[in-house]
């Protein structure tokens, strides 16, 4: 089971990762008759910690990656409408002309130690939000996913840079 834990801003939280299963039946046995379905994007999972103007980004391995994404650091205060929050998202490189997603390898050009400013221009991104773990001093992990998703959609202002990963609630009847 999931144990209660104390959330502290700027201390990354180990993400929940998907388990492999052999069949649809096994999925239903593990998670029940109602579940959310989302697209799997080919990007970098990120945990975004925000408190006022202070913003830090962490990878799924809990590594601080803020320096690779100065554009996110710059734009987040205009997108997030909360005093503080911990959000989960997938960063995906895009083709600026078509809006199409680019392969993960293109995004990894951002991970070079030098010429970050050039990489920001050459490899534009979108931040695709899918969960909220903490908001305005409250632990959101105790809420069910649908409630967290509503809260996320209330505080993240969607635009061409910040989007929600499309989600569908499915039922096994």
Task: State where each predicted segment sits.
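Catalytic cores of nucleic-acid ligases and guanylyltransferases
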Residues: 1-173
